[in-house]
Amino acid sequence: MAKTTDVRPKITMACTECKERNYITKKNRRNDPDRLDLAKFCPRCGKKTTHRETR
């Protein structure tokens, strides 16, 4: 089982327009303590949209 204080936890990225969770990635908590916002392609919207980290 993963530690609760893992430095590189798995996070889920959700589209800000349609709210679909499309991507799973890892991030470094020490370098990026805030939520990530990345421009990614959303297959449901069919265009490049902002994806935000979900909890």
Swiss-Prot record:
The gene is rpmG3. It comes from the Bacteria. One of its GO terms (cellular component) is ribosome. It holds the Pfam family Ribosomal_L33. Belongs to the bacterial ribosomal protein bL33 family. The keyword Metal-binding does not apply. This is Large ribosomal subunit protein bL33C. SUPFAM superfamilies: Zn-binding ribosomal proteins. Keywords: Ribonucleoprotein, Ribosomal protein. The keyword Ribosomal protein applies. NCBIfam families: PRK00504.1, PRK00595.1, rpmG_bact. It comes from Kineococcus radiotolerans (strain ATCC BAA-149 / DSM 14245 / SRS30216). GO terms for molecular function: structural constituent of ribosome. One of its GO terms (biological process) is translation. InterPro entries: Ribosomal_bL33, Ribosomal_bL33_sf, Ribosomal_zn-bd. HAMAP family: Ribosomal_bL33.
